[in-house]
């Protein structure tokens, strides 16, 4: 057992060590006045004036229009798959509702998949549509965070920078170099990178077996660096071609956490308040460790119903013990629990086990992290979501002591709190609203593999995953229906843009305000006390908002499991 905790500690130490240089590089990308030659070529090709400055309205409009154009392009490619080359299996085009769902999924950095990649998409579609939108979605989140940080850093300013400059820089300086290096490591470890759609092998019994291949390593690298999560294969990171060795599993985990953790350091560096960045990092780390401990202990404890049936769930020299249903033996409980906590903390959605097979308490962890949506979070957007809670914390503290709240030298007034609450409320309204609609929709029961509280959890998980732009699933739900493709697609769009746009408006409002020096009545935010308050507000606000739905799903399922009740 102690080896497991040493492994967890080592991973977290590596993440912390990598966050510093990565954060410094991100801050340099966001603040540098120099443009590389390839960036200047990109500006000329796009017709962009890099010296132009954009207010929050134009910054947000550029974000929306670029994402909208890429969504339409992705949709067109998915609908035209039958005419594209490199389609050795002759895969047909996706249906209109599935193509909408897939395009919305990947452009919003969600990567929800209502299809199985290796049997539904051609290699051309995987490269030109899917991998392209993986880059687009990840870069958009980081760029939005850059604009938001500038809003806090600037005083009496009218702009948040230039969206196109930020986009091009993040592409050429961050995403492409990192993805290229990681892809080479994956190829070295045995991840395929080929244009052949299939090879045939002869098994030990003499039978002929078809093995599907493709450009897996290039997709796999941006999948985790960009907190995307969509798999080339339906089994995702549980497939040996996506995750063949312990080293690739560790790189997957560190890749998911790299940019989200580094964004807190970049935030502190750009504001010249590095202690503030470490406080935000510490808040994320505290929540992450708590959720990791919960999912590990829940899964290692096993299922009492199986124990009553005579199954041996104890750790021994020949088995890892615990609840091994839906898990890879090569990963066991420890690496599976770490992956579960990481993929939903960083809103990646990649999986190396079936979340639907977790114990009720273990399954509550990914649900809760997606509902909170700021335990490190996705590339860029995780920091934005955390900062909205930080501003809310300052506001609540200011109200308790009877002073106008301030955050980083900016007064937080009625307009700012209204914008924060718009962003905060958009998330639960989407999750709970669509879940309620699905609960009364006549065809929902036909899509459920389970009845009772777990069936409800499958639906709740789908909309929490879509709205949080996570993409993982309780796979007992058949989501490839017109109803689920449409509503989950809308949930992904709502979760992305109905939170980003109010926060960009907030950044514009704060940028226009002068920065005032801290006074004797200013509530300090770069302290362990504020970190504790921030964690408290995140957990309480998230808990109170979603507690009734969690009580109907995993909580009651856990109680029934402990009492020996099962559903047919």
UniProtKB/Swiss-Prot annotation:
The annotated topology with respect to the bilayer is: Multi-pass membrane protein
Which Pfam families does the protein's record reference?
Answer: KdpA
Q: Which InterPro entries match?
A: KdpA
A single Gene Ontology CC annotation of this entry is:
plasma membrane
Q: Where in the cell is it found?
A: Cell inner membrane
Give the multimer and partner information: The system is composed of three essential subunits: KdpA, KdpB and KdpC.
**Which keywords describe this protein according to UniProt?**
Cell inner membrane, Cell membrane, Ion transport, Membrane, Potassium, Potassium transport, Transmembrane, Transmembrane helix, Transport
Role summary: Part of the high-affinity ATP-driven potassium transport (or Kdp) system, which catalyzes the hydrolysis of ATP coupled with the electrogenic transport of potassium into the cytoplasm. This subunit binds the periplasmic potassium ions and delivers the ions to the membrane domain of KdpB through an intramembrane tunnel.
Q: Where is the signal peptide?
A: none
TM ranges: 1-21, 60-80, 129-149, 174-194, 251-271, 278-298, 381-401, 420-440, 488-508, 528-548
Q: One GO molecular function term?
A: P-type potassium transmembrane transporter activity
Give the protein family: Belongs to the KdpA family.
The record's HAMAP family line, in alphabetical order, gives: KdpA
Classification from the root reads:
Bacteria, Pseudomonadati, Pseudomonadota, Betaproteobacteria, Burkholderiales
Q: Which organism is it from?
A: Delftia acidovorans (strain DSM 14801 / SPH-1)
Q: What is its main location?
A: membrane
Q: What is this protein called?
A: Potassium-transporting ATPase potassium-binding subunit
């Amino acid at each position: 057992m102690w080896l497991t905790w040493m492994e967890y500690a080592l991973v977290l130490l590596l993440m912390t060590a990598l966050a510093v240089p990565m954060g410094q590089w991100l801050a340099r990308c966001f603040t540098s006045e120099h443009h590389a030659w390839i960036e200047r070529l990109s500006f000329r090709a796009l017709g962009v004036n890099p010296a132009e400055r954009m207010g929050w309205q134009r910054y947000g409009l550029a974000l929306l229009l670029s994402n909208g154009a890429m969504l339409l392009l992705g949709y067109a490619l998915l609908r035209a798959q039958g005419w594209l080359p490199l389609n050795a299996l002759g895969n047909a085009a996706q249906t209109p509702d599935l193509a909408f769902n897939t395009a919305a999924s990947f452009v919003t950095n969600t990567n929800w998949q209502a299809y199985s990649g290796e049997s539904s998409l051609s290699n051309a579609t995987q490269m030109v549509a899917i991998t392209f939108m993986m880059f687009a979605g990840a870069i958009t989140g980081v760029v939005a965070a850059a604009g938001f940080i500038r809003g806090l850093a600037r005083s009496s300013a009218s702009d948040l920078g230039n969206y196109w400059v930020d986009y091009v820089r993040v592409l050429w300086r961050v995403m492409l170099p990192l993805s290229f290096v990681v892809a080479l490591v994956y190829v070295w470890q045995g991840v395929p990178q080929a244009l052949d759609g299939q090879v045939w092998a002869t098994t030990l019994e003499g039978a002929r077996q078809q093995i599907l291949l493709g450009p897996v390593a290039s997709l796999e690298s941006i999948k985790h660096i960009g907190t995307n999560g969509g798999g080339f294969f339906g089994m995702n990171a549980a497939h040996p071609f996506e995750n063949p060795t312990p080293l690739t599993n560790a790189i997957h985990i560190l890749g998911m956490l790299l940019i989200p953790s580094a964004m807190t350091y970049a935030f502190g560096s750009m504001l010249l308040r590095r202690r503030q960045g470490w406080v935000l990092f510490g808040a994320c780390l505290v929540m992450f460790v708590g959720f990791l401990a919960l999912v590990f202990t829940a899964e290692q404890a096993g299922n009492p119903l199986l124990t009553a049936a005579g199954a041996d769930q104890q750790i021994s020299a020949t088995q890892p013990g615990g609840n091994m249903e839906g898990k890879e033996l090569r990963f066991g409980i420890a690496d599976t629990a770490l992956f579960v906590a990481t993929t939903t903390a960083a809103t990646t959605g990649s999986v190396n086990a079936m979340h639907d097979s977790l114990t009720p308490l273990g399954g509550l962890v990914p649900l809760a992290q997606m509902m909170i949506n700021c335990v490190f979070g996705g590339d860029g957007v995780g920091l934005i979501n955390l900062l909205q809670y930080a501003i809310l914390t300052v506001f609540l503290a200011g109200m308790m002591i009877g002073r106008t709240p301030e955050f980083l030298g900016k007064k937080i007034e009625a307009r700012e709190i209204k914008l924060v609450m718009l962003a905060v409320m958009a998330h639960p309204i989407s999750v709970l609203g669509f879940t309620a609609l699905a609960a009364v929709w006549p065809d929902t029961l036909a899509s459920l593999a389970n009845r009772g509280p777990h069936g409800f959890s499958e639906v709740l998980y789908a909309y929490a995953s879509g709205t949080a732009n996570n993409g993982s699933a309780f796979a007992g739900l058949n989501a490839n229906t017109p109803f689920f493709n449409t509503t989950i697609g809308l949930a992904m769009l709502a979760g992305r843009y109905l939170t980003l746009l109010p926060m960009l408006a907030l950044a514009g409002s704060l940028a226009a305000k002068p920065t005032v020096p801290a006074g004797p009545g200013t509530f300090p935010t770069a302290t362990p006390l504020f970190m504790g308050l921030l964690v408290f507000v995140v957990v309480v606000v998230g808990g109170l908002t979603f507690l009734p739905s969690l009580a109907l799903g995993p909580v009651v399922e856990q109680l029934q499991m402990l009492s020996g009740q099962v559903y047919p």
